[in-house]
Regions:
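Metal-associated gating/positioning segment near the N- to mid-region
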Residues: 50-117
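Divalent metal-coordination and catalytic microenvironments
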Residues: 9, 22, 27, 51, ...
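His/Asp/Glu-enriched, well-ordered alpha-helical/loop segment
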Residues: 203-231, 298-302, 306-308, 313-389
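C-terminal cap of metal-dependent C-N hydrolases
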Residues: 9, 323, 377-442
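A glycine-rich helix N-cap at a beta->alpha junction
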Residues: 112-128
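Histidine/acidic residue-rich metal-binding segments in metalloenzymes
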Residues: 134-308
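Histidine-rich, glycine-flanked metal-binding segment
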Residues: 1-4, 10-56
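Short catalytic-loop micro-motif centered on adjacent basic/acidic residues
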Residues: 93, 123-126, 233-238
């Protein structure tokens, strides 16, 4: 049985940084050694991690891998490789594919695809519609990460817009409800207003006014109200405004029934970046003001925001052409998500410990994933080794997503992902992917 020693790393885990070493054996963390402590038995492989930080692998609860049916943009293989290169060891895939994951049959087909193609650990959401809530009772709570609810229209047109249906969804499942919250009526009013002035060529810079602060707040407010009425387990995804933060609490995560996610893009960019990046940063909900970004960053620290994810959503560059009404919404972010957040830590926005909490610990806790998300003895060895002070620049050559572009092209990072271990297997090693490896299906202890 192979034993691998990762030696002399700064281990970041559960709010602490310690110099130490980790032994991997049979997929799991066998020993955690502090300082000069020695392994209890010989190791077959020794990795000198001097100068590196060892983190639990990120768990990205919010990805769109476009498989099945939209594989001209992305597929499970390419995007899971991008995940591994970014230090992400587990993903949860969204249902707005073709066919949509809104039936039990489509759900089983998605699990089969993920098992055949994903290099990292995986689960997927069941998509809610106006009419399919009767199927919720048949969902396996140990396999399905949650129910995805689009309360605002986005890529895939899975909008649930009937109040009776919303009440049935919130009252009809014990699973986590992951909600995309934007009020469709307000979006339509805003769109009609600007179409009178610009026709179908509404400028891209007006995207945050079409999908406005009020559209986000009203929909999130309704979701919170319904969750409180039904005691549903609600997780609102990609919060984008300061105003929405008033809907959430910063009590300890274990006490929450209503949680909130911020995405890397909303923590990095502001509406001013449309001038240089254009449709590359067009997403739903829209990138908004610098004040909103600052409030979201502060909410990560205060506990109003519980997790950081990516909403990784690739499109071809040709599909990103046009203004606010024509360019498709979404961007690939998973490969550079962890290093982007570590860069914000260098700038004093977060601590490294907080990045680990929001990208690894909290997703494992919220989704009730046992034996992952922490560096603990007996846990699965989902680990990432990152090196600071290792300057490199994002180019198309290094992008593993099938779409082959990123809004971060030409950006220079000081942090670099060197190695990613999934279930103890060295999946990513300094630019090289083991294309033969497949991740494991996530299990939820509910």
């Amino acid at each position: 049985m192979k034993r691998t020693l990762i030696q002399n790393a700064v281990i970041v885990n559960e709010g602490r940084k310690v110099l130490g070493s980790v032994v991997i054996e049979n997929e799991k963390i066998a020993e955690i050694l502090v300082g000069e402590e020695k392994a209890t038995a010989p190791c077959d492989e020794v990795i000198d991690a001097s100068g590196c930080y060892l983190l639990p692998g990120a768990i990205d609860e919010h990805v769109h891998f476009r498989d099945p049916g939209l594989t001209h943009k992305a597929d499970i293989t390419t995007e899971s490789h991008a995940a591994a290169a970014g230090g992400v060891t587990s993903i949860m895939d969204m249902p707005n594919t073709n066919p949509q994951t809104t039936t039990l049959e489509a759900l089983e087909e998605k699990f089969i695809l993920l098992g055949e193609k994903s290099a990292v650990n995986y689960s997927c959401y069941f998509g809610a519609t106006n009419n399919n809530y009767t199927q919720f009772a048949q969902l396996d709570k140990h396999r399905v990460c949650g129910v995805k609810l689009f309360m605002g229209s986005s890529t895939g047109n899975m909008l649930v817009d009937r109040m009776a249906s919303l009440r049935n969804i919130f009252g009809g499942t014990d699973l986590l409800i992951a909600a995309h919250c934007e009020d469709q009526g307000i979006i339509k009013e805003n769109t009609d207003k600007y179409k009178k002035e610009y026709g179908d060529d509404v400028p891209l810079a007006l995207h945050p006014l079409l999908r406005s602060e009020e559209a986000c707040y009203r929909s999130s407010e309704l979701a919170v109200q319904l969750a409180r009425e039904t005691n549903a387990r609600l997780h609102i995804m990609h919060i984008s405004t300061a105003k929405e933060l008033s809907l959430f609490s910063n009590v300890p995560l274990a006490q929450k029934r209503i949680t909130a996610e911020a995405c890397v893009s909303h923590l990095l960019f502001t509406e001013e970046d449309y001038q240089t990046l254009g449709a590359r940063i067009k997403c739903n909900p829209a990138i908004k003001t610098a004040q909103d970004r600052k409030a979201l960053q502060e909410a990560v620290n205060s506990g109003l925001i519980d997790a950081i994810a990516t909403d990784h959503a690739p499109h071809l560059l040709s599909e990103k052409e046009g203004g606010a009404l024509k360019a498709m919404s979404g961007m690939p972010m998973i490969q550079f998500s962890l290093v982007s957040m570590l860069e914000l830590a260098d700038k004093g926005v977060f601590t490294i410990e907080k990045v680990v909490e929001k990208m690894a610990h909290a997703p494992a806790q919220m989704y009730e994933i046992p034996n992952r998300g922490f560096i603990r003895k007996g846990y699965q060895a989902d680990l990432v080794l990152v090196r600071p002070d290792s300057e490199w620049t994002v180019t198309t050559d290094c992008i593993l997503s099938k779409c082959k572009w990123s809004p971060l092209e030409e950006h220079t990072f000081d942090w670099k992902v060197e190695k990613t271990f999934v279930n103890g297997h060295l999946l990513y090693n300094n630019g090289e992917i083991d294309e033969t490896y497949r991740g494991q299906e996530l299990f939820f202890e509910r």
